[in-house]
């Protein structure tokens, strides 16, 4: 539920103000109040705690003054379970460096929250500012998508693109208390037509075989982009994804025609990466797991259906090896250098009024199953995540 707020943003010395915007809390398992406890706000003596914020500048007033540089929504995310203050920043940066233009834009920022009536604002420290995936996201990439007037779905847990499994799955709009498996984010057709299009894709994936499937995949999907996207996804150790856990992605069809479209997978939610490993799906080690068997292909068939063809598989394997080659963007020395440069920029600002997350540490999430992984403190071949992942890729 949104509440009214005013927003002030400073970008490279230039200030922007939006009055009467909307703000709400965001997150699934990570959603919590910005103030500890269940009571009302404690004036000038609040027990602040980190949480995620979603801003909608045009929630209440829909005019051009309620945008900032053409943007009307913004997602501010705290570095939950990421003492390294870099996992999602690194992930989207790597996507973009590798030519995956469907990856959202993000950056570091500093956040203050001022509750009306309090003497001073609370400093929340260093946050991650994320672009939201919506109609504005599509418009900014319309030349590459071919059209921004198609159908955009947010795929929540259980979205397998498996026709037999998902033909009766929930598809529609979220009502705030319930999120369907396939959640409408932006559609330019009626819901029935959008559903037919989504089910057509799944059914084609199930029914077509051999050369007919190969050719349809090449026509319906930007195969090179898709496989480079998935190469980055696997290099990052993203186990909570489509292939392994039927979770955390968007899909976009660039037309409203139920049978004639281009399908795009948009990567999403990359904080549990880079050595934050977990016993999930077919995996128990996100560093060493076989990149060709990343998930259960019977449950989530799309990637395996593509990789069964030698020419498509070569694109994927070549992309993985390009990433971790000595000249690649995932090579451990280059990756460590980028992370250290970011830390030099933000290090003086992480101490904050919540008292949480006040030190940068090279540790994966405490609930993970491989606590030995490191990003920059060690370059050991058995514990440095970049080197462990590269070794797994070189076996292909």
Give the predicted meaning of each segment.
Residues 48, 52-63, 69-83, 98-104, ...:
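Internal "kinase-insert"/substrate-recognition segments embedded within catalytic cores
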Residues 2, 104-111, 245-251:
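A short glycine-rich, hydrophobically flanked beta-strand micro-motif that places a catalytic Asp/Glu
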Residues 44, 181-244, 248-396:
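Middle-to-C-terminal accessory/interaction subdomains
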Residues 1-90:
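Conserved NTP-binding catalytic cores of kinases and kinase-like/nucleotidyltransferase enzymes
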């Amino acid at each position: 539920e949104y509440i009214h707020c005013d927003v002030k943003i400073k970008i490279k010395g230039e200030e922007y103000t939006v009055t009467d915007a909307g703000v709400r809390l965001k997150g699934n398992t990570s959603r919590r109040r910005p103030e500890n406890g269940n009571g009302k706000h404690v004036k000038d003596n609040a027990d602040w705690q980190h949480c995620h914020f979603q801003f909608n500048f045009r929630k209440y007033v829909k005019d051009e003054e309620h945008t900032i540089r053409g943007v009307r929504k913004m997602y501010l995310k705290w570095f939950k379970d990421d003492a390294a203050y870099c996992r999602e920043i690194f992930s989207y940066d790597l996507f973009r460096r590798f030519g995956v233009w469907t990856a959202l834009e993000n950056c570091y920022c500093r956040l203050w929250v001022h509750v009306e009536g309090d003497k001073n604002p609370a400093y929340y420290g260093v946050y991650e500012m994320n672009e939201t995936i919506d109609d504005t996201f599509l418009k900014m990439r319309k030349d590459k998508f071919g059209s921004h007037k198609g159908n955009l779905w947010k795929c929540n847990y259980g979205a397998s693109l498996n026709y037999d499994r998902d033909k009766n799955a929930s598809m529609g709009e979220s009502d705030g208390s319930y999120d369907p498996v396939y959640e409408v984010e932006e559609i330019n057709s009626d819901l029935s037509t959008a559903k037919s299009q989504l089910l057509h894709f799944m059914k084609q994936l199930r029914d077509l075989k051999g050369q007919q499937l190969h050719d349809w995949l090449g026509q319906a999907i930007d195969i090179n982009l898709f496989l480079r996207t998935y190469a980055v996804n696997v290099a990052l150790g993203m186990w909570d994804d489509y292939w392994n856990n039927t979770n955390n992605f968007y899909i976009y069809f660039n037309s409203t025609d139920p049978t004639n479209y281009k399908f795009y997978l948009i990567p999403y939610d990359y904080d549990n990466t880079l050595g934050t490993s977990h016993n999930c799906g077919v995996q128990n080690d996100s560093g060493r797991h076989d990149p060709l068997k990343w998930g259960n292909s019977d449950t989530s068939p799309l990637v395996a259906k593509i990789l069964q063809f030698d020419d498509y598989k070569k694109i994927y394997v070549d992309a993985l090896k390009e990433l971790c080659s000595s000249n690649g963007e995932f090579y451990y020395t280059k990756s460590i250098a980028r992370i250290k440069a970011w830390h030099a920029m933000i290090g003086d600002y992480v101490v904050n009024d919540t008292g949480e997350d006040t030190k940068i540490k090279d540790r994966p999430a405490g609930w993970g199953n491989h606590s030995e992984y490191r990003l920059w403190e060690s370059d050991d071949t058995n514990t440095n995540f970049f080197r462990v992942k590269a070794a797994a890729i070189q076996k292909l």
